[in-house]
């Protein structure tokens, strides 16, 4: 049984993950096999420090030991999950574990800046540490079904992914919640986006990405009214329309985490994760420029 550690308790994900890995306080159809959360560091928070005190006892109720330092956690675990609510905290929270070569999963958003994203990737490569990231929205039942159906009626010519895109101080623009719909889009389209245009209003974002092969993918992120998740896929032989349920999203993500830590095979390549972050940063930049196109290669390029 793989021993997992959690780092930073300012998100409900620490409760959701602990319950599923440890098979407690959730229905049996939510149980995950192959790994167990054995210890965690409550840590600190730049976005919601008041939430830690509420989530910590719920995590402890799952049988998780509380420790205070990375060294203590390193003595107890085989792999870690960095769960800080703020993407800007992930680099420093992950650093001691990556430097120790410990397999690491980073929760959303992977990073809030291109510099941090590159630094995380470089730490993993330098210390030969297994590192990956994914949104739970990649792992819904509907997305998995849609991906299998594409094999029958593809190829895919484009897609529209939609869902909530609430903003929060600490995770700029689409990085906070728009990342979920963006990861849905990339799960279908794959990497290769060159440029984005974001027509943003206080109510929503409409981001059009253009891929190297001419395909276009759209992220529609809402901040008012009903904000369900869903996706439209435009294929050679038809148009597929899927409303997406999150019922099994956490379970499927947690199972993917356990399986990936066992196999050391990342379901989402690190280069794709870096492109997703660059896409979101470019979308935020396009919004600042009143919808002007932004090349992904502009992000982080100071020349």
Regions found by a protein language model. Give the residues of each.
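Interdomain hinge/lid region at the active-site interface
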Residues: 225-265
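Hydrophobic residues in well-ordered beta-strands that form the structural core
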Residues: 68, 106, 131-133
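Aromatic/hydrophobic pocket-lining residues that form π-stacking "cages" and hydrophobic walls in ligand
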Residues: 93, 120, 146, 282-283
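Short helix/strand-capping hinge loops at secondary-structure junctions
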Residues: 101-103, 108-109
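N-terminal glycine-/serine-/threonine-rich beta1-alpha1-beta2 phosphate-ribose binding loop
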Residues: 1-100, 125-126, 287, 296
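Rossmann-like dinucleotide-binding domain that binds NAD(P)(H)
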Residues: 160-226, 271-278
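A contiguous active-site-proximal alpha/beta segment in oxidoreductase catalytic domains
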Residues: 111-171
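C-terminal helix-rich "cap/oligomerization" subdomain common to oxidoreductases
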Residues: 72, 76-84, 260-303
């Amino acid at each position: 049984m793989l021993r997992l550690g959690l780092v930073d308790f300012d998100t409900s994900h620490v409760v959701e993950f602990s319950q599923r890995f440890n098979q407690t306080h959730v229905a049996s159809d939510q149980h995950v096999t192959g790994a167990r959360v054995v210890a965690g560091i409550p840590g600190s928070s730049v976005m919601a420090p008041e939430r830690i005190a509420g989530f910590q006892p719920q995590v402890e109720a799952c049988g998780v030991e509380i420790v205070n330092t990375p060294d203590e956690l390193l003595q107890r675990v085989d792999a870690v999950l960095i769960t800080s609510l703020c993407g800007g905290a992930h680099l420093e929270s992950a650093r001691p574990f990556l430097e120790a070569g410990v397999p690491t999963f980073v929760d959303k958003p992977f990073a809030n800046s291109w510099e941090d994203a590159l630094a995380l990737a470089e730490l993993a490569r330098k210390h030969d540490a297994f590192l990956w990231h994914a949104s739970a929205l990649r792992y819904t039942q509907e997305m998995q079904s849609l991906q299998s159906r594409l094999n029958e009626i593809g190829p895919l010519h484009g897609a529209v992914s939609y869902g909530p895109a609430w903003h929060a101080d600490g995770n700029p623009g689409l990085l906070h919640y728009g990342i979920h719909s963006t990861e849905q889009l990339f799960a279908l389209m794959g990497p290769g986006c060159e440029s984005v245009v974001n027509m943003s209003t206080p109510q929503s974002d409409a981001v059009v990405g253009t891929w190297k092969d001419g395909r276009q993918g759209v992220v529609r992120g809402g901040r008012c009214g009903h904000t369900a998740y869903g996706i439209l896929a435009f294929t050679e032989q038809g148009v597929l329309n899927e409303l997406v349920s999150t019922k099994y999203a956490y379970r499927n993500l947690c199972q993917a985490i356990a399986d990936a830590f066992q196999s050391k095979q990342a379901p989402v390549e690190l280069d794709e994760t870096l492109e997703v972050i660059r896409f979101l940063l470019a979308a935020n930049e396009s919004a600042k420029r009143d919808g002007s196109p932004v090349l992904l290669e502009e992000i982080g390029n100071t020349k």
